[in-house]
Design a protein with these regions (language model features):
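Short pre-catalytic segments that frame enzyme active sites
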Residues: 179-196, 211-221, 228, 253-256, ...
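Short beta-strand edge/turn micro-motifs at domain boundaries
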Residues: 120-126, 130-132, 142-192
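Secretory targeting and sorting signals
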Residues: 12-38
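Beta-lactam-recognizing serine transpeptidase/beta-lactamase-like catalytic domain environment
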Residues: 371-373, 380-381, 414-447, 461-673
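Conserved SxxK-family serine transpeptidase/carboxypeptidase catalytic domain
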Residues: 37, 58-59, 91-105, 260-282, ...
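Short solvent-exposed beta->alpha transition segments
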Residues: 39-46, 60-106, 115-119
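C-terminal region of N-terminal signal peptides and the immediate post-cleavage residues
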Residues: 30-60, 121, 588
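Small/polar-residue-rich segments within soluble enzyme cores
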Residues: 172-176, 180-182, 190-202, 211-244, ...
Length: 691
């Protein structure tokens, strides 16, 4: 039986309601209604929260929807958001209040969309929209917070809850697509489109443009322009013209969709020009004009700068939504390391796509076709974020010096490198790696024994132990430490054997003179001296770099080998150029390849120490193994030759090194397989300094 004030199915309560605030499980304050007696309707908050979670997930199962089946509502949501790609949404209850009808409640939902994969929570209403309009709690105006954690698109929507005695919760939801967005109606959908931003340039010293958009041709097979059975044959022919793997291209073409364009290669305009006629003669082969971020030449600083191209599946997956299939992104080098900066922010547009129009069932047979088939309504833009171009990346590379270095290494068969640093700033002006490295950045990442170029470091350790440049050291034909015999290089001048000064030992590169001092400078002092010259340090160069390792502990033959830059001592050409730069600058130099400059290290090298080292390096040119540099035009040159044995062959193979300073320039030259520093690296250094 029911009391007089109630009706079956309607569950009407007559008590005057009051609006209160209660905290939900998610911490959101929700307005609820409490009556004055046990006859009041149950709390609607759980249903409101259940609805919010369901709208967020797209699964309406379990939500009391009145006359609408949960599976129908779920299917409707799925259809509405099918065009939103991987975008995700959060939905929270912000208000729940009684309407004019005391048996209904209106729930207000905050909806926040993460359109670009940032995974951010919803923003507060009232923040600035992309158009500068403040969003309010009563309109669905899109908003964008100025913080990185804000969603891309936010708005509010409402839903109506009704008292229902036949449900466990006591309430049902009036289902409508408008719960997902206020402007949605039956059959309407949401569609997200994305515009990739303009990629920024990579700049060199003085702001000179190095990498910018340059004309290219995308060459491939258009399967709509060739019979499917002949497509693999065309692919093979095209591969032979452009120099790619014929079998691989043919297989990709065979497996691609019937309307696919299958890329074979992207060619610079100048490289493609002589091939265009041959490409055109192949059925289905096309060359499409395009642009791509490229350096001045194909090989210009390629191991450093890297390349750009179509995003791989792995990059898309790892980007968290920032990158999508079809984007052109950095694939290696600085292009990949600074891709977010260079790539900018993609533009996003969400449109409401109206339902397809249907013919008027009351139309007569004489009605015009236009009347029978109304023109489709235009999509309406609900949210738009313009693409923001990338920010240029400023590097320290000097185009002229980099080009000169690469030109000198072009015909060097083994792995090789030339690195130039400006001592006054630490700026890396050139970091060229020869073709023998097969694309590896020998200049910055190579790990090799530095040989006698390390004697600059050993000299600093000896100076700190009390020696001077005029101190006598014993240059013997051989030196034996713990049973291991060390000797000088084969054509060491016989006149420089015996008691000589430290200056003469450096000038002529006497191995035994330094090994005979192994008790004067221990391994720890070598490591400290190396750090004072920037070798073995951990500076933020701005690009991947190996700045060397010098063990702090070693004794016996290992320590003796360290005295002449062998054993476990390793350096890259960049590291040895840093040593030379520190000598020239008069203080420890931190090399920098990308602005802003690296934090200068604490001053561990004194000006007085550097002055002595400068004199020792000048002695190499004035009276020693670098005499051939004496006539290089310009400021006086200081240098140090280096030859480092490696491998197990007899006689052992050797790395060829040379470092030099001239004015505000420090240079390191390296050839992985060479005769000696002066004979192999020396001519390259002389040509580089001579311009």
């Amino acid at each position: 039986m029911f009391d007089d004030g109630q009706e079956r199915g309607a569950m009407i309560w007559k008590k005057a309601p009051r609006r209160i605030l209660a905290a939900t499980a998610g911490g959101v304050l929700v307005a609820t209604v409490a009556g004055c007696s046990g006859d009041d309707p149950p709390d609607a908050t759980p249903v409101a929260e259940q609805l919010a979670q369901a709208v967020a997930s797209g699964d309406l199962a379990g939500v009391p929807l009145g006359d609408t089946a949960a599976e129908d509502a779920t299917a409707a949501v799925e259809a509405i958001v099918a065009g939103m790609g991987a975008a995700t949404r959060t939905v929270t209850v912000t208000d729940l209040e009684q309407t004019d009808d005391e048996n209904t409640r209106q729930v207000t939902l905050d909806v926040g969309w993460d359109l670009d994969g940032s995974g951010a929570p919803a923003a507060e209403p009232g923040t600035e929209s992309p158009t500068g309009t403040a969003a309010t709690t009563s309109t669905p105006t899109p908003t964008a917070s100025g913080t990185p954690d804000a969603p891309d698109w936010t708005y509010q929507t409402t839903a109506t809850l009704r008292v229902a005695e036949d449900t466990e919760a006591g309430w049902t939801v009036d289902w409508s697509p408008a719960i997902l967005h206020p402007q949605l109606s039956d059959g309407a959908t949401l569609d997200l489109s994305r515009t990739q931003a303009t990629r920024a340039d990579i700049l060199g010293a003085g702001g000179e443009v190095i990498v910018t958009e340059r004309p290219v041709y995308r060459v491939g097979i258009d399967k709509t322009r060739v019979d499917a059975a002949l497509a693999p044959e065309s692919a093979t022919a095209l591969a032979e013209v452009v120099g790619v793997d014929p079998a691989g291209l043919a297989e990709r073409v065979q497996n691609a969709g019937e309307r696919a364009f299958v890329d074979a290669i992207t060619l610079r305009e100048a490289d493609a020009a002589p091939l265009l006629a041959q490409i055109e003669a192949i059925e289905g082969a096309v060359a499409i004009e395009d642009t791509l971020a490229l350096a001045p030449t194909r090989d210009f600083a390629r191991p450093i700068l890297g390349t750009v191209g179509d995003a791989t599946a792995e990059l898309v997956e790892e980007s968290g939504g920032r990158i999508v299939a079809g984007d052109v992104v950095g694939l290696s080098g600085l292009q990949a390391q600074y891709d977010a900066q260079l790539g900018g922010t993609s533009g996003l547009t969400v449109e409401l796509v109206p339902p397809e129009p249907s013919g008027d069932p009351t139309a007569t047979a004489t009605a015009s076709p236009a009347a029978e088939e109304p023109a489709p309504a235009e999509p309406e833009v609900l949210f738009e974020r313009e693409a923001a171009p990338g920010t240029p990346l400023a590097t320290t590379l000097n185009v002229e010096l980099q080009s000169r270095a690469e030109g000198l290494l072009a015909d060097v068969a083994p792995a090789s490198a030339i690195v130039a640093i400006q001592p006054s700033t630490g700026a890396v002006l050139a970091a060229a790696s020869g073709p023998g490295g097969e694309g590896y950045s020998t200049a910055t990442l190579g790990q090799y024994a530095p040989g006698s170029t390390f004697k600059v470091v050993t000299s600093l350790a000896l100076l700190r132990a009390g020696l001077t440049s005029d101190s006598a050291v014993e240059c013997t034909p051989t030196a034996t430490v713990d049973g291991r015999e060390f000797s000088n290089y084969s054509d060491y001048p016989s006149g420089a054997i015996g008691d000589i000064t430290l200056r003469e030992a450096v000038a002529n590169s006497c191995n035994t003179a330094f090994i005979n001092q192994n008790a004067v400078a221990d391994q720890a002092s070598l490591a400290q001296a190396a750090a004072s010259l920037g070798l073995g340090a951990e500076y933020q160069v701005g690009a991947p770099a190996f700045l060397g390792t010098v063990p702090a502990e070693a004794d016996g033959t290992a320590h003796a080998a360290s005295m002449i830059g062998q054993g476990e001592v390793l350096a890259s050409p960049l590291a040895m150029a840093t040593v030379a730069a520190s000598v020239a600058a008069g203080h420890t130099v931190a090399p920098t390849m990308v602005d802003p400059a690296a934090t200068p290290p604490e001053g561990t090298l004194t000006a007085d120490e550097a002055a002595v080292l400068q004199d020792l390096m000048r002695a190499v040119v004035e009276e020693g193994s670098g005499a051939f540099l004496g006539d290089v035009p310009g400021d006086p040159v200081g240098a140090k030759t280096g030859t480092a044995e490696y491998g197990t062959e007899t006689p052992p193979r050797t790395h060829a090194w040379m470092i030099a300073t001239q004015g505000d320039l420090a240079v390191a030259v390296f050839v992985e397989d060479g005769e000696s520093g002066s004979r192999t690296a020396g001519p390259l250094l002389e040509a580089f300094l001579g311009g």
